[in-house]
Amino acid sequence: MASVVSLAGTLGLLLVSALPEVLGDRRSPDRRAHPGDAGQVGPAAAEPRRQSPPSKNQRERARSGALPLGALYTAAAVAFVLYKCLQQGKDEAAVLQEEADKKDSLQSEQHLAQLTQQLVQTEQHLNSLMAQLDPLFERVTTLAGAQQELLHMKLQTIHQLLQDSKPNKGVEVPEPEASIPFLEDFCIEEDEEEAGDNQAWEEPLNWNTGTRNLTPPREMQPTLRRRCRKSAAQGLSHSPHWKEGKTVDGLVKQSLFL
């Protein structure tokens, strides 16, 4: 705004200074033609000149000589002022553009600083979360490893027990259970033997009757059966195959219930 006012003032001063030259001094052509004849012209001669007004042609000639110079001067002054105004306007536009660029760059730097600060805060939050989750990850990993080891040990134990329960190739395989007599068979055989012995001692043998009656009396049968069961149970308890089967079954059940 101040630059515009100064330019307007400069233009006004130039126009005011150009006005006298445009108008000029309208002196008579006699004075212009004979400026040094002051002595020849006396007061008497000056009176008629003063009294006679200048002609119209003389005025037009004076104006036509003065106008082109003043117009050229004024046009040059106006052109110079306009040039200065345009140049100053360009300079002001460049200055404004530089200020706008500086302001934009400053805003960009501030925005970048804010983003950097937010990124640092986010990184700190992530680090704190990872620090809280690390113990949980370690516990889960430890528990998973322990469970895996325990399961592996159980599988190895079961496999070993199954291998131990199988008969070896170099050892003779015992006869099936059908070859082992039942408790009642032992009891019946012993009853028959004892009854036969008692009858042999008490009664004479009758070889003519064909077969002997080895059945013991009814009063002695319960006692004989109890004794047979006890002796059979003791014999089976001393059997190595029975002990091995029992221990293997017990170990398998125990490992499965762990």
UniProtKB/Swiss-Prot annotation:
GO terms for cellular component: membrane. Its main location: membrane. It is a single-pass membrane protein. Residues 25-35 have a biased composition (Basic and acidic residues). Keywords: Coiled coil, Membrane, Signal, Transmembrane, Transmembrane helix. It comes from the Eukaryota. Residues 106-134 form a coiled coil. Residues 1-24 form the signal peptide. The chain crosses the membrane at residues 66-86. The keyword Transmembrane applies. PANTHER family: COILED-COIL DOMAIN-CONTAINING PROTEIN 107. This is Coiled-coil domain-containing protein 107. It comes from Bos taurus. The lineage of its organism: Eukaryota, Metazoa, Chordata, Craniata, Vertebrata.
